[in-house]
Amino acid sequence: MSDRTVDRRPGDPDRDTRFLYVVVCAAGVASGVGELIGAARQRGWETGVFATPTALNGFFDTARVEALSGRPIRSAWRRPGDPRPFPPPDAVVVAPATFNTVNKWAQGLADTLAVATLCEAAGLGVPVAALPCVADALAAHPAYRDSVARLRGMGVRFAARFTGEPDEHGVRPEFDWKQALDLVEQP
């Protein structure tokens, strides 16, 4: 894993690869986040992963994700004077985006590094995509609907909401990790 410090602005043409921040929240599908990192690498992205504290508590294989990204997962703020472990992003993805994170993000409640990273992304001028994983009952809550509308108004690109519920034939759909890349790579 690299502890290198890279100071550059988003979209810096002097860099060979693009850098993607991946924010992972605590939902059952988080176990598949390695698919996103692998797909990002195939498309020429380097990745840095931020996780909510709850997501770190068994929702995905942290050792595998660190091995895939080549960098430590971040979930806590660095101390003053510590180097930045990731360069600034060229794009930011939150997948899966949970009810709690979407609502905190829209309200600017940066109580975790993961949510603070999303809040800051609005001011960076880079593409931001969200792949929500929210149950129907929670999605019906007015706060969630308002939060999605507010974030869309800020330019966040949302994929269709994933519920994980089986279809009429009893088949559970797959979480489409690559959709996050499609969203941030749109012109």
Task: Specify the residue positions occupied by each region the protein language model found.
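A cross-family phosphate/adenosyl-ligand binding-site feature
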Residues: 1-187
